[in-house]
A protein has these predicted regions:
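Ferredoxin-reductase
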Residues: 2-89
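FNR/FR-type flavoprotein reductase catalytic core
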Residues: 77-139
């Protein structure tokens, strides 16, 4: 099992996309390069906060530009704190966690062997839809 690491992320954008639903994009090149579809990361509140880290599904990961995108509902003190972050703010983010989805792999990658032509149906509801974007991109 890979060792969990904590990285420094920089908020690129953080916007409300629906009532009480936020989309935060972080520049965190090391974490973005490690992310796989279906994983999550712990986001850590400010150092002086008494709030515990929040596990949030990775909605998108772009290893080329070094960004991770998270979509989350503002439901308590922790996510309310995150909703107040602005571009340029620092956020501590864990390395991607969880097994993730088993997807057919591109040639040479270590995952499920490539299956050739494949049709897939992705099903998610509510917050469960967030990791489907990165899975769809991978397929």
């Amino acid at each position: 099992m890979p060792e969990k690491k904590i990285y420094k992320g920089i908020v690129v954008s953080n916007q409300e996309i629906a009532d009480g639903i936020m989309k935060m994009k972080l520049s965190a090149p090391e974490a973005a390069g490690e992310a796989r579809p279906g994983q999550f990361a712990n986001l850590y509140p400010a150092a002086d906060s008494l709030i515990l880290p929040r596990p949030i599904s990775i909605c998108d990961a772009d290893g080329d530009d070094g960004t991770l995108t998270f979509v989350y509902a503002v439901v308590g003190a922790g996510t309310a704190e995150f909703a107040g972050y602005e571009s340029g703010d620092t956020v501590r983010v864990s390395s991607p966690l969880g097994t993730g989805f088993l997807l057919p792999s591109p040639a040479g990658a270590e995952s499920v062997p490539a299956l050739g032509s494949l049709n897939a149906v992705l099903i998610g509801g509510g917050g469960g839809c967030a990791p489907m974007l990165v899975a769809a991109k991978e397929l």
